[in-house]
Every structure is written in structure tokens, then in C-alpha cells.
Amino acid sequence: MECIERLRRKRTEYLFKNFIMIKFSFFNYRINMRNFHATSLRFIKFNYSAIKNIRNFSTEKKSEPKLSLFLTNISKILSEHKKDLYKAQEIIETEWLKLATPSIDVKSDIKSTMYAKQRLIHGRAFDLLKLYKSNGNLNKISKSLKDYIVNEKFIFIAWSYLLASYSKSSLPNLDYRIGYSITRHIYRESYKNDFMSFEDFPEYNKFDLGFFVKLGDIFINTFTSPLNPIFERVFENEIYSLKINKEYEYEIMESLVISPKALPMVCPPLIWWHGIRGGSVINLNDNADDSLVVGSFHHSHKIAISDKLYSVINKLNAFKFKINADLLSYLQNEGSFIIDFYKKTKKDTYINNMITLDIAKTYLNTPFYLNVNIDWRGRIYTQSFYLGYQGSELSLALINLFEGQKLDEEGLFFFYVYGANIYNEGGKFSKKSFQDRFNWVVENLDNIIAMDKDFILKAESPTLFAAFCLTMRKLKENPDHPVFNPIFLDATCSGVQHFAAMLLDLELGKYVNLINSGESVNDFYSQLIPAINKAINESAEKKLKNVKFSDISLNRSLLKKVIMTKSYNVTTYGITEQLKSKLEKVEKIIISKGKEIKVYDYLVPTKNGKFVVLDTFEVETLASIINDNIFNQFPKLHSIYEYLTRLTKIYLKLDIPISCSTPDGLELTQRYNLSKVQKLTINFLGKNRTAVLRSWVSDKDSRREVPAIIPNIIHSLDAAHLPMLIDSWDSYILPIHDCFGTHPNDMFKLAEQVRECFILLYSKNDFLSKIDSKFRENLKDYKIEIVNKNGEDFVKIKGTPRYDYLPLPVLPQMGELNVEDIRDMGKYMIS
């Protein structure tokens, strides 16, 4: 039987190769040219059995996938240039599109079978692209660009975009991003000159939003066609998206192509400064257009970057890392059950995890750096997508500090505390003292050293905990063994911490551990849950439609993210989506307009340990009740929300820019542009559906300005806190927004410095008063009069036919919190 199967596969391989050479002529097919749309490419007639044979040949593998050609070539470059890693980085950044195709000098080092397997994905995609040109389909996109479009490197660009973004972007968004990126490459290589900027290029050629979407979808079709079905198009909840065809997981892993921007750097990133592009080596090139500020390009936000922030970025970029070799080896051998566990429980991240492992193998023997960017609020983000301290749990676990240290007494203590934190089975350590967490590790040393499968999988973060256990094994053998693992402590709902300090609210400060005289940790989330459940239950008595809510009992795991994001002004819709992502789903089919539609009900826990079934509309009602009652016991939070939103509305009424200064001197301007909806008809599997696309214009989107002001202010305060901290710190510091990482030996000092900088943020900077003063200065600059009537300030707005007077918001009343007390009583501010 095995012999017959081998012959069948060889025959299939032969047929497929000849099938490519004769441009698919033995398939009786045609492309539907009527009502053409980029997403309507579909094969009307083809031999399904032949495709099935091809699919079986390409996916029947009995061994683990090999390292992709792309990563193999990067490994070769790193090895050949290990004494000049700047040169290695330069080659990777400038030649990355060539690394996926064997050249004369590297082909001898690559097994021909690997090359053949890679061609099964990229080769099929490129042949399909050439087919679309020969059949005239590219003429429907652009006659002027059709010859430029058929370029194999654009297949690699599209492929790298798909791998990085398929799971978190809608299909129309992917279409646009790929089409836009390819158009930009065509412009740079063939059209760039002194007479036309890229901004003018689309207008000159009459390329609208639909053009970019259609061009991108042509390339996506090369990976979703029945002849190359690596991804599957799905349509759920009125949204088109992609999912990976599970039969092709091994082929995908052996065909990786990753943009250098998503990879670590092997030399220190270039220095950023005013007017000087830093980061990637390619930024020395005049054609490069990388910016330190990323995200929100559709809008007109502004940030004036300070000298201090540039220095902080350069300091973070200079930190050196290496792969955790012990963990990588463990996950590939006796610890492979963790990856299998993720494959079963987190299917949507499995491919990304496998890519992360392959990148770790590639950089195993090479030190690396993690390039960072900022957004317009000053928030810091690592650029490396698959391997970085702001990435997935696996990504973080595989990173070690390049310079290790023997643990001192404080380092050992906080290393144990961190071990308990990442185990945290069932959230049991949320209220425990540091000493209790330390004691838990001492009591479980035998289990930790044994690394039993069941024990590891009970951890909240299995890969991080496995890395901890492996280091503990080394420490048992040799207490002087240097430790390279970074450890992290997390702030208690940092948004509320900022509001508590801003308002000097003593009670609120206690709940979020700014002030805590005891050894038990206050759990802000648990404090709010009883009142939320009470409001939900009482709604059943007030409204008959809420009768199902009478026994609902939501727990901490369901409400933690809701409460945390409410401090960032999350909407009822946002709460609904968070609940739906956490609750157990029950699929059902309903009939609408004669069509079957898949929808979900949700199982919501009750007081008696059972569940009540709610449909989507009932979950929305539940979210609305939560939103209305979540902060009722803290009226000062409502007062600051009211103040900031009213201030924003006046800015909008007067049509002047919404701007503020952060305590560290950053000048920020918030400005959302209006988006317009464009509908395109998409033909998918013979059925017409409508995709909603958005384009942005320069008009202000007033509806977004008001709800965005609170999260943007809080994010900017988080961002202001970090530069103060990093600027005063001489060792490793790894920021994950409101989470702080360093070597275990430095964690005690880092926690102290976090408190000191937080105190400095609010003791010397009366932030709310400065916002109010800045607002009044802006009114003066725009020659807008403030009038006082009976002790109340009004702004004079010219109306028709008379002047209108709009009352100015009054600053919230301050409380009795002494921020200096945080120094000695804020031990659990980060825990």
C-alpha cells in the first residue's frame, strides 16, 4: 500500500508540474468576465478531483516542517557575517524579497525538496498572477500598471502581509493594505522622480479606494483560488475575513516570508533625533520613509517630540537580547505538549506561535535588538511582530536579557514572586502579598523542578512558567548560575490610578493600591463586582424583558477587562464585544428572508452555578446595564468624565484644535478625520455580497472626538510616566504600557522608581488645572471672549442673529490624597 501511495503522489506531482507549464490548459476552465470585480475572480469549471489530488500531495507529511527557505537564508547570512552584524542587517533589510527565491550562490545549500515545496505555494500564486494577466483580468485593474503588477516579489509582499494580519484584519482592509503597499513599491521603482510625489501618483492615475482594494484582492486570490487554497474566505456577522486552510499548515511554515520590520534587528538600531530617521538600517536610504510615529495615519493628530522622548527611544533600542535556548529546546522536545495544548485551545494563534518558534531558531545564536516606535500620544510599541516583549506569551517567554546576573537576595525574592504571578491558577494570587507568593514557590519547589505536564498546564501562562521552571532547575544545580530571564510587575488598573492621583481621591487610591498600609492586595475589580451584579439582578424586577437577569452572577474573569477598559471610556458596544468574547457560545441556525444564517447564543453564569442562555440582543442589554452602573460607587470618576467631555464639546463648538501638554512636556493635538463609507459588491462562491470600505477625508469627525478624549488623555499620561522612569534608569527596562519589566535583581529598585516618577507626575504638575489653563489660553489665542455672570464663566459664541453663551465646565473638587504617601504606602501599586 505504501508503495502504491508513493507512486500516486509522484504521478500527482508530475501532473501538477505539467499543469503549470501548459498554463492549466487541461482543466476545462474559464474566468467569469461579466460584472468583473477583483474579488469576483472564480473558476466556473475545473476538475475538482485533480485539485483534491494536488491538495493531498502537498499536505501529506509525516515529519515536522523544515525551516523555510527565507529563514534558512537569513540563518546563512547571520552565520557568514557574524563578525559584521551591521552588514548582515543591511542585507536582510535590502534583499529580503530575494531571500525567498534560491539564487546561484545559495541554491547548493538548499535541499531541492524544500525548494519544490516552497514553489507549491509561491510558485502556484505567481503562475495564477501571470494567468490573470494573460486572460485580461489585470486590464480591469489598470492597463498602465499591468506589466508592473506581474512581479514575483509582490507575491512575497502579499504573503508576508497575510501571515502577519489575516487573523486580525477584515478582508477588505487586507485588500486595501496589500494593494496600497504594492502600488507604493511600483511608484518607488518605476515612477519616482522630482516631478511627482507618491501623494500625487494615485490622483494622476485616477486610482481611488476601489483600485487599491481590487489590486490587493487580485493578490489575495492567488492564495485563495481552488488551485492554491492556502486561505479560505469566510463571511460571518456581515464581515469578510480569511482563515488558514488547516490542511496546509506545514506548507505555510516551510514557505514563510516575513518583512524585516516584523523581525528583530541584529545590530543596534540607528539613532532617532529631530529631522534624523533612526531605527532600521534602510532609513539611511533617501527612498526610505519610515517614521518614528506610527498608527492613525488616516487622522490628523500631532505630537511634538521632545528631546527626552528621543533619548528614551534610543535607550530602549540599545538594549540587547538573546533567545532563551533552554526554553526553545524544551518546547521542541519534552515540552512540546505546551504547543499541542495551544493548538487545541488557541487555534487562531497556532500559526503565529509556530512562526515565532521558527524565528527563534533562526536567531538562536545571534544577539538582537528590538526596535521601538511611538504613537501620536507618546505610547511606546516594539516593532518586531513575532518576537518581542510586547508580543504573545510565547514571544515574551523566548526572550532573554543578553547580560545575566547571579541572583542576590532581592532578586531571588522577586524571581519567586514572578513565578507565582505567572502560575496564578484560577487567579488565586490577585489578592496575595508578595510574601505569600514567595512562600507558594518554596512550597511547590518539587513540582516546579519536576515540571510535570499537568502541573505546567494549570499555569495561567504555561510557556512563561516553563521558562521560570527551567531556570529554577539551573539554580538548584548551581545557586550562582546567572539568570537572564526578565520579570514583570503589572499596575493595578492604571487608568483608575491616574484618575485617583489626578483627583487626589483617597478612597479610590486605596482601591487601586496607591495607598495600602497592609499586606493584602486590594483587588479593585472584585470591589466593583457585587454592585454590578446587584444592578443586573434588580433590572429583572424593573423590566419584564430582563426577567432572565434575576439570577445572573458575573465573576472577575468576565468583568476584569470590562472594568479596566471602562476607565478608558469604553462604550456599551465595546463591553458587549468583550462579554461575547469571554462567554461560552452556542451555535444555532435561524432563517432570515428564506436563508439560513449562523448566529450564537451565550451561556451566562448564575448564582446557583448554572447558566442562563442569552441571545445577542440580551447580551447588549446586559452590557448597557453594566456600563450605566460600573462606577456608581465612585462619583468623582463621573465628575472628571463630565469635565473632560464638556471641555471637548466646547472645543468642537468653537472649531479650535483640541490640544494639551503632558507633564513631561509633550504637546499633543487630537484631530479625527471623517470617514466615508463606500460599498463594493463582492462575488464570493457565486453569491453577491456587499463589503463596507472606509475612506478618510480632511473634514473633522466630531462624533469621535468626545468619546476619544478620555482614553487618549490616560494613554498620554501612561506615556508621560514612562519617559520619566526610563530616563532615570540605568539598567534594562522593558515597558508594556502599564507593565514594567527588568532583571529580578533590579525589580525592587524599579518598583520604587515607578512610585517616585508617579509622585513626580502629580505632585509638581497639577494636571487638571493645567488642562483648564491651556484651554483658556487657547480661547485667548483665538480671540474668543470669556464672560463671567454671577460667578460662573461662559464662553461667548457668535450665533445667529445674536451671541450665545456656553457655560464653561468647572474643575472637579479635589480630595484628600497626599501623593507623597504613595512612596511608602504604594508597595502594591505594581504587583
Curated annotation (Swiss-Prot):
Gene Ontology molecular functions: DNA-directed RNA polymerase activity; mitochondrial promoter sequence-specific DNA binding
Organism: Gelasinospora sp. (strain G114)
UniProt protein name: Probable DNA-directed RNA polymerase
Transmembrane residue ranges: none
Main location: mitochondrion
The organism's taxonomic lineage, starting at the top: Eukaryota, Fungi, Dikarya, Ascomycota, Pezizomycotina
Keyword annotations from UniProtKB, A to Z: DNA-directed RNA polymerase, Mitochondrion, Nucleotidyltransferase, Plasmid, Transcription, Transferase
Catalysed transformations (reactions): RNA(n) + a ribonucleoside 5'-triphosphate = RNA(n+1) + diphosphate
InterPro entries for this protein: DNA-dir_Rpol_C_phage-type (IPR046950), DNA-dir_Rpol_phage-type (IPR002092), DNA/RNA_pol_sf (IPR043502)
